[in-house]
Amino acid sequence: MSQTITLIKDKILSDNYFTLRNITYDLTRRNGEVIRHKREVYDRGNGATILLYNSTKKTVVLVRQFRVATWVNGNQDGMLIETCAGLLDNDEPEVCIRKEAIEETGYDVGEVRKIFELYMSPGGVTELIHFFIAEYHDSERASIGGGVEDEEIEVLELPFSRALEMVRSGEIRDGKTVLLLNYLQTSHLMD
């Protein structure tokens, strides 16, 4: 017998910006035992992220911005260095990430390559993130970036070796960014 899930109750606790739901479900184990669970699930929609790299200059483009959740959790100034990212908002992942790249970094990149899709915090968050990389060139800079009207985003062009050192030193602590930097390193695209 395989494990089965039966939804008992799905209650919306909050739907201000994203949706917080209280889910009650029965888990029937393989041995037939039924266990009732109650969990809060945060549904913020799915997202996409991209690491821009230049294999000639050996650089990457990251952004620095305030992230309130990190501030609440002890990040003193709330600033986080990360890859460009955004929510899909009914767009296809590649369409979304191209828009975000222009808005946040100012780069209108050519070919983008999807690497993988991952759940970053599946214990309580529904978000599935689509991960991309793209080579960028100075000639593709369409604007200064910095985000839309309610965002304050600093664009960082860093030597790839410096970005890797920032992961080791703890200056970069964003999971999606660490994954993409490690992917770039192990793929040997910067060799």
Curated annotation (Swiss-Prot):
It catalyses: GDP-alpha-D-mannose + H2O = alpha-D-mannose 1-phosphate + GMP + 2 H(+). It holds the Pfam family NUDIX. It comes from the Bacteria. Its EC number is 3.6.1.-. Residues 43-180 form the Nudix hydrolase domain. A motif (Nudix box) lies at residues 86-106. One of its GO terms (molecular function) is metal ion binding. Keywords: Hydrolase, Magnesium, Metal-binding. Mg(2+) 2 binds at residues 100, 104, 151. Mg(2+) 1 binds at residues 85, 104. One of its GO terms (cellular component) is cytosol. Transmembrane segments: none annotated. InterPro entries: NDP_pyrophosphatase, NUDIX_hydrolase-like_dom_sf, NUDIX_hydrolase_dom. Its cofactor is Mg(2+). GO terms for biological process: nucleoside phosphate metabolic process; ribose phosphate metabolic process. GDP-alpha-D-mannose binds at residues 17, 38-40, 67, 85-87, 104, 127, 150-151, 176. Homodimer. NCBIfam families: nudix-type nucleoside diphosphatase, YffH/AdpP family (TIGR00052), PRK15009.1 (NF011585). PANTHER family: NUDIX HYDROLASE DOMAIN-CONTAINING PROTEIN, UDP/ADP-SUGAR PYROPHOSPHATASE. Belongs to the Nudix hydrolase family. NudK subfamily. Nucleoside diphosphate sugar hydrolase that hydrolyzes GDP-mannose as its preferred substrate, yielding GMP and mannose-1-phosphate. In the dimer, the N-terminal domains are swapped between the two monomers, such that residues of both chains contribute to the active site. This is GDP-mannose pyrophosphatase. It comes from Salmonella typhimurium (strain LT2 / SGSC1412 / ATCC 700720).
